[in-house]
């Protein structure tokens, strides 16, 4: 609610307008796309082409992701490549400034970020190059700023896919492989990250971002609840 201090009236409509103005006025940060995985679940498809360059509905998966990001007001994208990374050479997207950083060997999701740390902005939206998740970036980023956490994770409240436990807008447990009766949400694949998190937990060897950072930041991750569906290129189908 917005409170008028002269009359002490509380007005939901005015509060909504203030929030909308704040969201509209945000300068959107860089998007960082993890696009260096081997894509083994796709079998023969990814032996000759990176997963995020596979054509889906007439254009590469990466183009779909960048089209959404651009429509949300993002203008800069850092794309982290690895497997067959040379195939990204010459890739362009209208309205977006693209920077590609290729790792010389498979370093895991965390290692890929560390390999590109000099190109990262102080805040960035972290995406997976094989997921299409059309969540409202402006609202997500506004929520990140409002809660003043260094990491905000988009969470879908799904019991079928659950891989985390959240409570009072905080993530307390996460597992990529284990199942727990306490889990009540699923990481949707879009996060807002402060570069300071990478500086704190980063390693010079191969390491997993999600399996390292999420458990160690238990209770410090803001859970942004949003039921926007996402599509994962996990199988050829």
Regions picked out by a protein language model, each given a short descriptive name:
Residues 147-157:
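A short, conserved acidic/glycine-rich loop-to-beta-strand motif
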Residues 3, 82, 101-103, 154, ...:
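Conserved beta-strand termini and adjacent loop/short-helix elements that scaffold enzyme active sites
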Residues 52, 97-99, 220-222:
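Conserved beta-strand segments of alpha/beta enzyme cores
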Residues 29-33, 41, 55, 59-139:
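Conserved N-terminal catalytic core of the sugar/cofactor nucleotidyltransferase
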Residues 124-125, 132, 138-145, 158-159, ...:
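Catalytic-core segments of class I nucleotidyltransferases/pyrophosphorylases
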Residues 38, 49, 84, 131, ...:
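A generic "binding-loop/recognition-motif" signal
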Residues 44-47:
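Conserved catalytic-core motifs of eukaryotic protein kinase domains, centered on the activation segment
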Residues 1-27:
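Aromatic-rich peripheral "rim/lid" segments of glycoside hydrolase catalytic domains that contact
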